[in-house]
Design a protein with these regions (language model features):
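Glycine-rich phosphate-binding loop of ATP-dependent small-molecule kinases
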Residues: 1-325
Length: 325
């Protein structure tokens, strides 16, 4: 996919500045207000090569938006608490509220790629299938998810690194992040290409950006953000209207008629019940031990009517388990 990006894209600086400062700046603020009014949450993932000036792209974009409506995250590593939780727990906690926006300069993709270059005992574990499933949950939940990758040439990356090292304002930032790409361009290009091929899905496609010229990159990102959020707000609003609860009682009864299909006449005699209870409690005990040694976690959820027997079912289930694990 990266080979499809035209890194030679150029635009006249005067025209580009006018479009960025006036037209696109206004449009970015407008689509943010529209998303807020509709109650649609937005997630922007800004990935790319190291030294592709993503911070400047994000910083410029935020100048045109209401700071009360967005949060910017840069997930470069997991702390000890994060490591004890499922991989995506960190990101679930950072999801924007309805109408708000979360922007990632580094996201779950950065941490996933770190696996290939970090020491094995420091790596975090997930797969592209897990990422696709996570993103499908987001888009199914009506989050507007936009993913960008800032592509650049090896020569431009080296030039940007030199410029950054010369900039005193960058001196506070540690230069030893999870990995350094300079000098390993082909290795990382292969890694990024595999990542995008595996995660370029219909519900969450990648938008590839030409990053050799910073102003062109800003133009491409901002234009796409405006276009995609506009489309997403229209779809979100239409879907919301279609799902508006009906005031017709008979229609509502049909919607929840699934419970009438449950066979409540089923019974089991006491002897059979006792025999099967002991049998399956023994199986549960063995499975718990196996899960413990394999490091597999489990969650059991019980829902139902009051006095339906949920408490009794839980007691019989836990009676077969070791309470310490």
């Amino acid at each position: 996919m990266l080979n499809q990006v035209d890194l030679g894209t150029k635009m006249k600086k005067e025209e580009l500045k006018e479009v960025l400062d006036e037209k696109l700046g206004y449009e970015l603020g407008r689509v943010q207000r529209h998303a807020r009014a509709a109650g649609m949450p937005v997630i922007l993932v800004i990935e790319g090569w190291r030294h592709s000036r993503r911070s400047e792209i994000v910083g410029t974009m935020m100048q045109f938006m209401d700071a009360r409506g967005f949060r910017v995250y840069s997930s470069t590593k997991f702390n000890e608490e994060d490591r004890r939780m499922p991989f995506f727990s960190k990101f679930w906690r950072q999801l924007p509220e309805p109408g708000n926006m979360s922007v990632y300069r580094h996201s779950w993709y950065y941490l996933k790629n770190a696996i290939k270059v970090k020491k094995e005992n420091e790596a975090v574990s997930t797969s592209f299938e897990h990422i696709n499933a996570f993103e499908k949950q987001l888009t199914d939940g009506q989050y507007c998810l936009l993913k960008f990758f800032i592509h650049m040439s090896e020569e431009q990356q080296k030039n940007n690194e030199k410029d950054i090292k010369r900039t005193l304002a960058k001196a506070w930032r540690p230069h030893d992040e999870i990995y350094s790409e300079v000098g390993s361009y082909d290795k990382f290009k292969k890694c990024y290409s595999e990542m995008m091929e595996a995660t370029n899905t219909e519900n969450a496609p990648w938008h590839l950006i030409s990053g050799d010229d910073l102003e062109v990159a800003k133009y491409q990102v901002f234009t796409t953000v405006v276009e995609e959020i506009n489309k997403a707000v229209k779809a979100f609003t239409a879907d919301k209207a279609a799902k508006k609860p009906s005031t017709n009682q008979s229609e509502n009864e049909k919607t929840y008629d699934v419970l009438s299909k449950v066979d409540l006449s089923k019974t089991v005699d006491k002897d059979t019940y006792k025999e099967k209870l002991e049998k399956y409690q023994e199986k549960i005990r063995a499975l718990q031990a196996e899960a413990f040694y394999k490091g597999v976690s489990a969650v059991f959820a019980f829902e139902g009517w009051d006095a339906a027997g949920k408490g009794g079912a839980i007691r019989r289930l836990t009676a077969a388990m070791d309470p310490l694990s």
